[in-house]
Amino acid sequence: ERHRAWWKKFWSVSEISLDDPVIEQRYYLSKYMLASVARDPEYPPNILGISTFDRPAWNGNYKINYNHQSPYLNLMVSGHFQQSDPHDAPYLKLMEISDEMCKRLLHHEGLYYPLGLGPHGLVSEALLLHMKSPAIHGALNMIYRYGITEDETYAQKVYPYLRGVADFWEKDLVCRDGVYHVVGDGMHERTDGNIRDNGVPEDPVNTLGYLKTFFTWMPRISEALDLDEKKREKWLEIAENLAPYPKGTIREIQENPTLWKEVDVKLEDLLPEEMLDKEIYYDEGIGGKWSFHFPGNVMQIYPGNA
């Protein structure tokens, strides 16, 4: 009876009706899976979801470069906050370590997170791969949660984390002629060899988007909580003066090394001639401007192998 009552309550929160029965079935199937594994606030589901293996890929951890963040968006917009809130646990438990890591590696304060986290403050995979965005990417889920609910109790819980992320970027952004640039942060995973080939990455399109949203919302949240009044002007100033999203044409990046090392086919062979000169957004302003492998960092692979 308790089992039935739990599911009845869960399904009564929201519903959808679609013209396509296959997509509708997949929607409810994904909800069923996430509701089954995302119940313990201290132990959110890892990258493998419902799957188990003796030697799990990616160490079976919380991969916080989009894999961990993305599934919870669908829970939040459908009102299932009890299942979406476990997302936050790995971030909140690692704040002390990540602050120390930032001081040692970047020589300033703030929250600087590695790629693979475990529960209870465990670093499962101490890889950085030339990325600085994982912490702010996770912060966006928290901001969306507050934006949907305006739950000040929740905001109080996550605010120390959000403030730590703000501290990181206030100190790490490079201001040139009044414009804030992201330096040393790849759009996605970057090897040392890739950095040697393409240079230190700057102004990744995804991180610029994260920063715009983050620093636009931080003054609102701090005002709701009556905290950090003196910081709000600075946060808005950053949001309004970020570097523009990198863009150009396909023809202009035909010689970009990242185009040719991943696949044998040339990008120009996949597109009609008239599209080669249309303006597009690049992955990074400096560095790997295009990738067959990780286009725009919008794909995600959760649950891997399921």
Indicate where each model-derived feature is located.
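Acidic/histidine-rich catalytic neighborhood
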Residues: 164, 168-224
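Glycine- and aromatic-rich loop/turn segments at beta-sheet edges
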Residues: 41-56, 101-105, 113, 173-187, ...
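Secondary-structure transition/capping motifs at alpha-helix termini
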Residues: 36-41, 78, 82, 145-156, ...
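Acidic/His metal-coordination segments adjacent to aromatic residues that form catalytic metal sites
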Residues: 48-59, 112-129, 183-204, 279, ...
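Active-site core of glycosidic bond-cleaving carbohydrate-active enzymes
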Residues: 61-100, 104, 117-123, 127-160, ...
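Extended, hydrophobic/aromatic-rich amphipathic alpha-helical segments that build helical scaffolds
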Residues: 24-36, 135-144, 160, 164-169
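Acidic/polar, glycine-enriched structural segments that form the non-catalytic walls/loops
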Residues: 1-61, 81-85, 92-100, 286
